Amino acid sequence: MLHRVLVEGFTLTQLFSKRPGVELPAYRYRFRQALLRFVSRTAPQKIPRGPLVLLADGLWFQFDGVPWVLYLTALKPCNGDYATFLDPMLLQGKEGATRWQKVVAAIPPQAMRRIGAIVVDNLPGMHKLASQHGWVLQLCHFHLLLKLQAQRRGMRYALRGGPVREEIHRLIHSALELPAGDPLARILERLRHLSRGDCGTQRVQTTVREFLKGLQFYRAYLAHPHLGLPHTTNSVESMGRLLREMFRSSRSGSNPESVLLWATAFIRMRLHIKCNGHPIN
């Protein structure tokens, strides 16, 4: 039953329609009890061997006007192209470094000792978190470039307002990938010039300055090729999208307890996900 709902995508109503003689409330109760039994077991994750990279992202919820964040973590072997998800953690309040400290503290010690890097969005306190543990910090390219885009009818498109904004997007994209040398130096100088002048909205100007300030962390994957760092958190975000779809179709995310229960079971059914760090256009 769990596999058909959490992996095959059936809803309880669809499965119930094929079970004559059973009332729907009783069927839902049986399913919840099966979920509880499954989640109460020892976590089934097998930590990959060798040096590891920690991938992390948060999934936001709101209950009765109060923010909650489901913290997702996965471990990728430096020489591998897949990530193994750990059990999620749900904490009340906005996403931040203090709560990420709690999440990191829950990682099994035998895995913690082998983590050499972390890939995250550019959130306040992440530099300190990485430094405290002696980890290389790789900031997500996708989130950075997304700040230079906007939404229109569900699709991303480059912000309008003149060719300068398009130039900034192109320059930053190149600066994320170019090796050290004169071409990169010229691009960075141009970005510094634009950050001091009229480069569109204040938000875009701030994004350029933040990028220049954290440049080494966006380019960590180039400085540490032996770590096999992905330069996005896309694999973790893919899990987040799957969870959102599951909550939508099952209508199971009505309260914090339900979110954590279903998310834990869902992730345990899908422990591994491909992690390639695809390029961003």
Residue ranges and their predicted role:
Residues 1-2, 24, 263:
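Short, leucine-enriched amphipathic alpha-helices that occur as contiguous helical runs
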Residues 1-11:
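Short, amphipathic alpha-helical "recognition" segments used to contact nucleic acids or chromatin
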Residues 11-21:
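DNA-recognition alpha helix
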Residues 20-117, 124, 128, 136, ...:
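RNase H-like nuclease fold core
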Residues 69-70, 150-162:
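Short, surface-exposed amphipathic charged segments that create phosphate/polyanion-binding patches used
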Residues 110-116, 120-132, 163-281:
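Acidic/histidine-rich catalytic cores and adjacent linkers
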Residues 133-156:
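Inter-helix linker motif
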